[in-house]
Amino acid sequence: MTKIANIKAREVLDSRGNPTVEADVILEDGTLGRACAPSGASTGSREALELRDGDASRYLGKGVRKAVEAINGQIRDALLGKDAADQRSLDQIMIDLDGTENKANLGANAILAVSLAAAKAAAVSLGKPLYEHIADVNGTSGKFSMPVPMMNILNGGEHADNNVDIQEFMVQPVSVNSFGEALRVGAEIFHSLKKVLKAQGLNTAVGDEGGFAPNLPSNEAALAAIKEAVEKAGYELGKDVTLALDCASSEFYKDGQYQLSGEGKSFDSEGFADYLSGLCDRYPIVSIEDGMDESDWDGWKVLTDKLGSKVQLVGDDLFVTNTKILKQGIEKGIGNSILIKFNQIGSLTETLDAIKMAQDAGYTAVISHRSGETEDTTIADLAVATCAGQIKTGSLCRSDRVAKYNQLLRIEEALEGKAPYRGLSEIKGQG
């Protein structure tokens, strides 16, 4: 029933107007599963390879015809007649077919699109919602939770054309009892922030992930604006709402220094750890992502020793959803959380393996979108299915972001109280 009858792929556009891969997996019973691969802007150097054409005459060289051809040719031939419900076997066939450490032959974007489309097709054929099927694949059948959203309401760094160095300033509604209420709180704060910025004569255009992207005198000015917005929305910062940062430090780490060009400051690893610690002293920041460069493991150790007992320290560029790298981090006591991005590793199976490794080691796993997104909502189901407890999927604006939030609303409704929203206790160091 769940045997694969056909696979086909096409070039579609992501939220930045760049091509990405969409794959259809059709089963013998006629069931269709469809999925798109996302794409990042600030990428870790050890991520699986996103295959692009490099043909300057099309899409500025960013076309993905090679990846589409890989799906319509080699991948299709290898998977026809295989069981879409056997996720691990399907993914392993594609990994072996590629034959490289970083999926450089077929492309992580090609393999991932097929991997997710197969999972969707199997779920439909088996008469199950996607989150239920992913939980079955994960060996955690029947266990679900709703994630705390990290809402990126103010953008800087590679996600915006402004002078703010830190890439993401996020709010987390933690005092409510449901995801639906958390979404409402986030939306109210988002609209409040727009009014705060307008009152200061600042630009209210949005960045790649739907957050506002004004020019500000410092990173702390961004935090101050969010604090004012939270309070004007009627909430208490530190009680109802906590803050999270994504520094994306690799983007401003040069010659052994963390260079905050927007502020005209430069720090060594110890100094930057002190800078971040100071922000945490002045604001209720409970999570910091990529607080050090991906290659600065000594700096990561300094940061972990300084803040790791009270702040969630999330490795994104550091770990790139890769179990081999995560294992090293766990052994060395680096960070205490991992950001999970499907396309950093390139298959559903490997993504689930990374989440399990993190959770078994007492690390949290934060499910994440990419800055280049589509209408695909698979990460919403993944967050619920793995009881990850946290999700990053942008601001309360742009359909590519809101699509994931709306899917979570549907899932919460369908589960009728069987997926608790645990709030602050989901965040490492807070529960």
Swiss-Prot record:
Q: What is its main location?
A: cytoplasm
The annotation note on the cofactor reads: Binds a second Mg(2+) ion via substrate during catalysis.
SUPFAM superfamilies named in the record: Enolase C-terminal domain-like, Enolase N-terminal domain-like
Q: What pathway is this protein said to act in by its record?
A: Carbohydrate degradation; glycolysis; pyruvate from D-glyceraldehyde 3-phosphate: step 4/5
Q: Which domain of life is it from?
A: Bacteria
> Which Gene3D superfamilies does the record match to this protein?
Enolase-like C-terminal domain, Enolase-like, N-terminal domain
Q: Which CDD domains match?
A: enolase
Q: Which GO terms describe its molecular function?
A: magnesium ion binding; phosphopyruvate hydratase activity
Record: residues binding Mg(2+)? 246, 289, 316
Q: How the protein assembles, per its UniProt entry?
A: Component of the RNA degradosome, a multiprotein complex involved in RNA processing and mRNA degradation.
* Name of this chain's protein: Enolase
Instruction: From the UniProt record, report the name of the gene that encodes this protein.
Output: eno
